[in-house]
UniProtKB/Swiss-Prot annotation:
GO terms for molecular function: mRNA binding; structural constituent of ribosome. It comes from Cupriavidus metallidurans (strain ATCC 43123 / DSM 2839 / NBRC 102507 / CH34). One of its GO terms (biological process) is translation. Belongs to the bacterial ribosomal protein bL12 family. Keywords: Ribonucleoprotein, Ribosomal protein. It holds the Pfam family Ribosomal_L12_N. It comes from the Bacteria. Homodimer. Part of the ribosomal stalk of the 50S ribosomal subunit. Forms a multimeric L10(L12)X complex, where L10 forms an elongated spine to which 2 to 4 L12 dimers bind in a sequential fashion. Binds GTP-bound translation factors. Signal peptide: none annotated. Forms part of the ribosomal stalk which helps the ribosome interact with GTP-bound translation factors. Is thus essential for accurate translation. This is Large ribosomal subunit protein bL12. One of its GO terms (cellular component) is cytosolic large ribosomal subunit.
């Protein structure tokens, strides 16, 4: 009579933690595999859906300059490190991205500085 999958599951279910540990070690030695590598490899698949839903890179887009153009240019220079002419060209060309591919904290900080200067900003 052959051992079925259900027989194996029943036997494993009846084992103590120490016996299961010994069984895992025996599998590792017999088949040349590592249970730790399997657990690590399985983890990204399990959390993949949650990671895909949470966005990690953001773009800060200057939508409208507002009435305080000079203040917005100063804020753009501070955020990007651009020179005066480059910052002015960016502001004159709104809507344009100010920062791309930044983390949430950086995007929020840039948005606050630009809004404080009177601009309308989108974070996408």
């Amino acid at each position: 009579m052959a051992i079925t999958k259900d027989d194996i599951l029943e036997a494993v279910g009846a084992m103590s933690v120490m016996e299961l540990n010994d069984l895992v070690k025996a599998f590792e030695e017999k088949f040349g595999v590592s249970a730790a590598a399997m657990a690590v490899a399985a983890a990204p698949g399990a959390g993949g859906a949650a990671a895909a839903e949470e966005k990690t890179e953001f773009n800060v887009i200057l939508a409208e300059v507002g009435s305080n153009k000079v203040g917005v240019i100063k804020a753009v220079r501070e955020i990007t490190g651009l020179g005066l002419k480059e910052a002015k060209d960016l502001v004159d060309g709104a809507p344009k991205p100010v920062k791309e591919g930044v983390d949430k904290a950086t995007a929020d900080d840039a948005k606050k500085k630009l809004e404080d200067a009177g601009a309308k900003v989108d974070v996408k």
